[in-house]
Amino acid sequence: MQIYPLRFVPNKINFDFMNFKKVSYSFSIILSLISLIWIGIYKFNFGIDFVGGIVIEVRLDRAPDLPKMRAVLSALGIGEVVLQNFESEHDLSIRFGSSSEENLMKNIDIIKTSLRNNFPYNFEYRKVDFVGPQVGRHLIEAGAMAMLFSFLAIMVYIGVRFEWYFGFGILIALVHDVILALGFMSITKLDFNLSTIAAVLTIIGYSVNDSVVIYDRIRENLRKYHKKNITEIINLSINETLSRTILTVITTLLANLALILFGGKAIHSFSVLVFFGIIAGTYSSIFISAPILTIFANRKFNKKVIER
């Protein structure tokens, strides 16, 4: 039995992506500026990982219904509430932010009353701690360093595998994706917490993967078509990898959609941000990182690009 490959576009498709180069550049610059301006004015909706808050440790007589408990506590109107087990399924950590110290005891009483009225458990409150914002500043610095090191590692990898100007194209695309992701997070008021930093790093990885696939085909076509100019080669390479790109983005979005619908509040911000980032990363790999190579069209491509 013969197996045919799954394709979403015709084999001989020849869509002129490069014809939209100036439009895509202008569109991306406008979106990036809007994102930066919005972030500058409205900032982020920082979660308790960054602004500090209260940590309540409680032991229950049996395993709690965490999804229901999250829903009940989130409806209290005291901001983000994070619940998670530690040590055992009977031990629960409840974390929430507080706008002022005056509200601390009031919010603690609200939570205790809500738990007592809505759940038939025996609660043993073992510890109540205040987590200051200085911890949040440390986490912000750690997150920024994580993104910086990921950029540097990617640049080294691309420089070794291709050439430095390929790395330049990917760097521009990554900066574009991160700015749009942060702008989207600010506009939609998604919680800025440790999971959203993980989401940004996931977006970076996805965008690089998409761009490397196209770059690899560009390098291969440079070997095959010596008489074609760089614009034709880039167009050809994007079209040849288009079916793979569409298949990858659809399957990844569907998997991520399941997380958005069924993953619960704990990973909601992560899932929504990754969903947006996958779309942005796919766009940037086609319309930004590849067309940027035409900047070097008037230069002779290094032999190492063709020989590798």
UniProtKB/Swiss-Prot annotation:
GO cellular component term of the entry, any: plasma membrane
Which family, according to the similarity comment?
Answer: Belongs to the SecD/SecF family. SecF subfamily.
Name the job this protein performs: Part of the Sec protein translocase complex. Interacts with the SecYEG preprotein conducting channel. SecDF uses the proton motive force (PMF) to complete protein translocation after the ATP-dependent function of SecA.
Q: What is this protein called?
A: Protein translocase subunit SecF
Which residue ranges traverse the bilayer? 23-42, 140-160, 164-184, 194-214, 246-266, 272-292
Q: Which superkingdom heads the taxonomic lineage of this protein's source? A: Bacteria
Coarsely, its chief localization is membrane
Provide the GO biological process annotations: intracellular protein transmembrane transport; protein targeting; protein transport by the Sec complex
- Membrane association type: Multi-pass membrane protein
Which Gene Ontology molecular function entries are recorded, alphabetically? protein-transporting ATPase activity
Question: How the protein assembles, per its UniProt entry?
Answer: Forms a complex with SecD. Part of the essential Sec protein translocation apparatus which comprises SecA, SecYEG and auxiliary proteins SecDF-YajC and YidC.
The answer on whether this UniProt entry bears the keyword Zinc-finger reads no
The alphabetical list of record keywords is: Cell inner membrane, Cell membrane, Membrane, Protein transport, Translocation, Transmembrane, Transmembrane helix, Transport
InterPro entries according to UniProt = SecD/SecF_arch_bac, SecD/SecF_bac, SecD/SecF_CS, SecD_SecF_C, SecD_SecF_C_bact, SecF_bac
**Lineage, opening ranks:** Bacteria, Pseudomonadati, Pseudomonadota, Alphaproteobacteria, Rickettsiales
